[in-house]
């Protein structure tokens, strides 16, 4: 979403005014790459223009911004979905999150401008519960509450980026998968097809990003 703080985050971690930042939504018109190398590893951050509501897409350049945002998702290994804490989950956030999910990308939800929210000891948990409902179609995605302006929890964001990348790239041996499958079938019997019990032969993992599994059964 425009003006959620994506460019401010890039500038904070880069330590320079790498991307134009202003209070005007949509300042970033193009996707720009920033290479960062630190104690967490080497990263290439792709900053994009946010996706606007349809009613606000009045210029051809905005159409290109939407296309470039989706192209950035296609290029990325991990998608950091930046939310504005003062606005919560919006239609535009849903679109980009849904696209990243459909493309099988590792994702992290970063709730920005957390320093501007009035809080008590329950605020974060209440916000997290609401986000879990909003992101019910992506229940596997971790959340982090940050401030791109102050740098609050940026280290945690790095950790989650590395963690989700590792999870999405994970390859599990066929032997381990079949041990798990054998245990599962002792607990729950395979379903029946037209009155005949299905027999599961084995499971394998043909690919990663995202981890994909194929189970071989009779009558399939």
Task: Provide a role label for each language-model segment.
Residues 1-46, 54-67, 71, 75-82, ...:
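C-terminal-of-GTPase-core extension/linker across diverse P-loop GTPases
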């Amino acid at each position: 979403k425009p003006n959620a703080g994506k460019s401010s985050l890039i500038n904070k971690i880069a330590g320079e005014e790498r991307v134009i930042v202003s209070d005007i939504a949509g300042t970033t018109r193009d996707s720009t790459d920033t290479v960062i190398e630190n104690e967490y590893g080497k990263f290439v951050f792709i900053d994009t223009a946010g996706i606007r509501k349809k009613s606000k897409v009045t210029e051809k350049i905005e159409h290109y911004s939407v296309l470039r945002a989706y192209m950035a998702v296609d290029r990325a290994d991990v998608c950091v979905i930046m939310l504005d804490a003062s606005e919560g989950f919006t239609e535009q956030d849903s679109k980009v999150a849904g696209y990243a999910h459909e493309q099988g990308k590792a994702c992290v939800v970063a709730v920005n401008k957390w320093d501007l929210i009035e809080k008590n000891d329950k605020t974060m948990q209440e916000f997290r519960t609401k986000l879990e409902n909003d992101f019910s179609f992506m229940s596997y995605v971790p959340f982090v509450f940050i401030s791109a302006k102050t740098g609050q929890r940026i280290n945690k964001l790095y950790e989650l980026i590395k963690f989700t990348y590792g999870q999405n790239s994970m390859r599990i041996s066929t032997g381990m998968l079949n041990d798990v499958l054998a245990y599962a079938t002792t607990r729950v019997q395979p379903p029946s097809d037209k009155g005949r019990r299905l027999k599961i032969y084995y499971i394998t993992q043909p690919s990663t990003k995202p981890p994909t599994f194929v189970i071989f059964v009779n009558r399939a």
